[in-house]
Amino acid sequence: MSGKSPAQTRVVVGMSGGVDSSVTALLLKEQGYDVIGVFMKNWDDTDENGVCTATEDYKDVAAVADQIGVPYYSVNFEKEYWDRVFEYFLAEYRAGRTPNPDVMCNKEIKFKAFLDYAMELGADYVATGHYAQVRTDEDGTVHMLRGADNNKDQTYFLSQLTQEQLKKTMFPLGHLEKPEVRRIAEKAGLATAKKKDSTGICFIGEKNFKKFLGEYLPAQPGKMMTLDGVEMGNHAGLMYYTIGQRGGLGIGGQHGQLTSDPWFVVGKDLTTNTLYVGQGFHHEHLYSTSLDASDLSFTREMPETFDLHCTAKFRYRQEDTGVTIHVNGDKVTVDFDEPVRAITPGQAVVFYDGEECLGGAMIDVAYKEQKVMQYQ
């Protein structure tokens, strides 16, 4: 933290209209900071009935800001979001991958476009309602730690943040558990105290994912096959399926199958537009032993090349897995201590040293004993 007192320290809070960011603003105000609330409009989400959830969310921001006595603004990042997040989202699906727009949104919008805007407002820091913690060393190095609420920890989505971004960021909810955040909101009588949490990708909201994606990318139906070459039917388009997926295949008890085990997506081949399926949660083709990833970013300064044994997550809320990472610039090879199920190209692999989130990269390809897994 700077040598300024809280009263001299301006913190611009990203307020979404949800309970987490509302309590973030409240706590900072109670601690004596000079707080400004900012609502980011990242997507035109007007539905076919002319209803825009962003309008309702902004009303909630205004109500909470008025209640706690802080000024508030709205800023439009629709163009930045389209260019930096949505175009990436579509490009990944075109490439047969499964993107993670939340990771990209934090990297490009909430901690870049928003951070820049906050600095124009004279901010010393930005703050968000994410469940993560920061610890600063005497030399000024900032470490990003998991949130105290293990069920809500969001460091996975914040893994692409840089040291420069973290030095200007506060996470006031990091030491709290979610039920306590709700209690604080209710005790303060905040307008958002009972508002349910938003889930899913912000620009899709409650819409049907298949229908939404089909509006932007033409679906290309193709063959659904087993790895032995047995045809199992047709798929609706590779972009609608992810590695390890069970539902939506439409192949129940048929084709003289030998067991009653459910069917899963075990592979994709973009060149032939084939979806590969197999029976059993633990199908051998779902397991790999290493991966290559790119766009590697660390939360603090690291050497250009090094090897390290640490733990990793390959998706949100997954148990940590022991790994050895081999870093070369912005690329990394990750060897798993034991085989891992359903590694998904396009998703983030995030590295941890105990409680500290070291950073992350985007998965390009998975291997099983040096053999490329046909996952895209």
UniProtKB/Swiss-Prot annotation:
The keyword RNA-binding applies. Residues 152-154, 315-316 are annotated as: Interaction with tRNA. It comes from the Bacteria. Its EC number is 2.8.1.13. It catalyses: S-sulfanyl-L-cysteinyl-[protein] + uridine(34) in tRNA + AH2 + ATP = 2-thiouridine(34) in tRNA + L-cysteinyl-[protein] + A + AMP + diphosphate + H(+). GO terms for biological process: tRNA wobble position uridine thiolation. Residues 100-102 are annotated as: Interaction with target base in tRNA. The record marks 130, 347 as: Interaction with tRNA. ATP binds at residues 14-21, 40, 129. Its main location: cytoplasm. Keywords: ATP-binding, Cytoplasm, Disulfide bond, Nucleotide-binding, RNA-binding, Transferase, tRNA processing, tRNA-binding. One of its GO terms (molecular function) is ATP binding. One of its GO terms (cellular component) is cytoplasm. Catalyzes the 2-thiolation of uridine at the wobble position (U34) of tRNA, leading to the formation of s(2)U34. Disulfide bonds join 105-202. This is tRNA-specific 2-thiouridylase MnmA. Belongs to the MnmA/TRMU family. It comes from Lactococcus lactis subsp. cremoris (strain MG1363). It is found in: Cytoplasm. Transmembrane segments: none annotated. InterPro entries: MnmA-like, MnmA-like_C, MnmA-like_central, MnmA-like_central_sf, Rossmann-like_a/b/a_fold. The keyword Metal-binding does not apply.
